[in-house]
Amino acid sequence: MAKAKFERTKPHVNIGTIGHVDHGKTTLTAAITKVLHDKYPDLNESRAFDQIDNAPEERQRGITINISHVEYQTDKRHYAHVDAPGHADYIKNMITGAAQMDGAILVVAATDGPMPQTREHVLLARQVGVPYILVALNKADMVDDEELIELVEMEVRELLAAQDFDEEAPVVKVSALKALEGDEKWVKSVEELMEAVDESIPDPVRETDKPFLMPVEDVFTITGRGTVVTGRVERGIINVNEEVEIVGIRPDTTKTTVTGVEMFRKLLDQGQAGDNVGLLLRGIKREDVERGQVVVKPGTTTPHTDFEGSVYILSKDEGGRHTPFFNNYRPQFYFRTTDVTGVVTLPEGTEMVMPGDNTDISVKLIQPVAMDEGLRFAIREGGRTVGAGRVTKIIK
């Protein structure tokens, strides 16, 4: 029994299982927790299939998603693993970003090969920016014909290549069910899969290593000291006396210097990703800055009005619209801390979008918003969420 040490310094990586319904995503998730528990019992608890399958409901940007989170560790890394059992749940999770992935395990049954949902999941993973996919060829115990397995592997590699994923990614033959039952050969296959995950999914860039960005939630004047903006630092680090820019909503970008950082009324030297802070800004009047703008490291983010997005529209049962919408639909787009009205153009050949659909749209906002590709938003009508999406391409 190997002994792995628990270290907070281990890299933390978010992964998930994706693929066609009934190809064994949830069974594989359970098998991974069991195999790693047996290998490193002091680090991992085993999770039964039905614990994962009865995925708890979560609300993300006003959308309810059934999703399971499990945690486990290998010798090298600490993983948070998400499994969305239903196809619709998977789509909603990918688009709303309830659980962002640094890499994914694509589960393909060796008995079936890639199915329509397999393709859709890989396409969606590409659209929402999952950086890396490797493959678990599941149910491999049920296929005796070596050539058949090779054909399935070739098909899967072509599918990955078609969406610009690594064609040479590891493809590991596993049997999740047999591994759960403790069959030695297939337990090894799951260990092999996790070694491949350790080796092939790159370490994510930590949020603190990215350029500083803080969405403005509130603005105050402190007599004798100046203007303070508050918010939660989204990424990066801000030090006292650093220059920043205020971007978005207004036509012009404003430069200023942060003369103080405070958290819970205490003065700090710096604020970092995840902290709720107040920033004291030099020479800025209260009316120069407003909610919905962002404070950023100069030159790292620009404001835009025109973009393309991948969106999921809530069904009526989820509290969404009862009717479809058409070209020139004008809802509000909620980015970070504020709503901005935008005009929607549907893709060529799409006449309307029904509640419950996912689609690509082009949007023209009436005010510029600081955005990068990958930024998520909610679609709202009078404060009620009717959809969610992600910026896939900036036009202007």
UniProtKB/Swiss-Prot annotation:
Region described as G2: spans on this chain: 62-66
Q: Main localisation, per the record? A: cytoplasm
Its recorded reaction(s) are: GTP + H2O = GDP + phosphate + H(+)
Q: Which Pfam families match?
A: GTP_EFTU, GTP_EFTU_D2, GTP_EFTU_D3
Return the CDD domains for the record.
EF_Tu, EFTU_II, EFTU_III
Broad EC category: hydrolase
Where in this protein does the record put region G3? 83-86
A GO cellular-component term linked to this record: cytosol
EC code: 3.6.5.3
Region annotated G1, chain positions: 19-26
Compartments where located: Cytoplasm
Record keywords, A-Z: Cytoplasm, Elongation factor, GTP-binding, Hydrolase, Magnesium, Metal-binding, Nucleotide-binding, Protein biosynthesis
Q: Where is the tr-type G domain?
A: 10-205
Where on this chain does Mg(2+) bind?
T26
One Gene Ontology MF term: translation elongation factor activity
Residue ranges of region G5?
A: 175-177
Alphabetized PANTHER family for the sequence: ELONGATION FACTOR TU, MITOCHONDRIAL (PTHR43721:SF22), ELONGATION FACTOR TU-RELATED (PTHR43721)
Describe its function.
GTP hydrolase that promotes the GTP-dependent binding of aminoacyl-tRNA to the A-site of ribosomes during protein biosynthesis.
Q: Which family does it belong to?
A: Belongs to the TRAFAC class translation factor GTPase superfamily. Classic translation factor GTPase family. EF-Tu/EF-1A subfamily.
Quaternary structure, per UniProt, is: Monomer.
Please give the name of this protein. Answer: Elongation factor Tu
Q: Which gene encodes it?
A: tuf
